[in-house]
């Protein structure tokens, strides 16, 4: 499989960023060469100890539960350490063919409609979200041995919302959004050249929100809360959205 095949062509149309699964030739090659690889062996056995999560203390709605945990990550109650940057989250997307990719983004808001983050609409993640409007977000709050998985359908946020959030960004980040053709292959000086160009263009003026920049919202149909415990006997509770709009809560085996 060529590198082009692996990473897709950013200049390509939005519908098929990453074509096709790995070819058999590539898999055979990997199997042949695997014995030559030096194994990085990790034998640590960290023990996680979070406050126990029980059905009795779970909120009836996952949004409420998320709010409680997020507030505890920011301002922890006695005995729990604070979480550095709890809004940092791993967002997983996939192509129409089902090839996944993941990367970190910053959660910028959450309400009954879903979980919002902002990005470039021509980036790899956005091209994948256009081709396959489903995503998963994973929060890992190491300090508190907590994990949350959100799975749902996605939609772009209203233009007005993107513009009003963009207006709150520092000027440098606003100009960066104009300069960066996110996920595109570029030359060594392209970014600086483009930044210089947009600095000139917006000199003495407010920086508008570019058309190619804005938010995505994940409207969840599944949210799981994971709380780490000793001997890998963690607590897991999954909320699943039912046809009648109610959330069904199940405990899952760790
Ligand atoms: C902690 C952290 C937060 C980030 N936040 C964002 C973000 O909010 N939006 C964004 O577009 N990229 C963000 N990035 C960069 C992305 O991880 C990624 O490199 C970029 O969006 C391009 O991804 P893509 O090529 O898969 O589209 C962040 C990276 C880190 C490590």
Where are these regions (language model features)?
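Binding-site signature for planar aromatic cofactors or substrates
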Residues: 1-254
């Amino acid at each position: 499989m060529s590198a082009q095949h692996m990473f897709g062509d950013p200049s390509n149309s939005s519908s098929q960023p990453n074509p096709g699964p790995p070819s058999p030739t590539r898999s055979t090659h990997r199997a042949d060469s695997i014995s030559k690889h030096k194994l990085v062996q990790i034998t640590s056995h960290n023990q996680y100890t979070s406050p126990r999560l029980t059905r009795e203390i779970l909120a009836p709605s996952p949004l409420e539960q998320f709010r409680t945990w997020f507030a505890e990550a920011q301002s922890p109650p006695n005995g729990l350490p604070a979480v550095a940057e709890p809004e940092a989250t791993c967002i997983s997307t996939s192509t129409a063919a089902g090839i996944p990719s993941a990367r970190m983004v910053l959660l910028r808001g959450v309400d009954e409609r879903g979980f919002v983050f902002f990005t470039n609409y021509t980036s790899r993640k956005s091209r994948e979200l256009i081709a396959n409007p489903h995503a998963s977000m994973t929060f890992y709050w190491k300090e508190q041995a907590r994990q949350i998985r959100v799975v749902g359908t996605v939609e772009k946020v209203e233009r007005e919302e993107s513009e009003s959030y963009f207006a709150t960004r520092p000027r440098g980040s606003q100009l960066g959004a104009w300069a960066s053709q996110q996920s595109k292959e570029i030359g060594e000086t392209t970014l600086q050249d483009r930044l210089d160009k947009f600095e000139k263009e917006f000199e003495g003026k407010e920086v508008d929100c570019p058309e190619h920049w804005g938010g995505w919202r994940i409207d969840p149909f599944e949210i799981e809360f994971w709380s780490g415990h000793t001997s890998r006997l963690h607590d897991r509770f999954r909320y699943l959205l039912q046809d009648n709009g109610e959330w069904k809560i199940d405990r899952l085996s760790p």
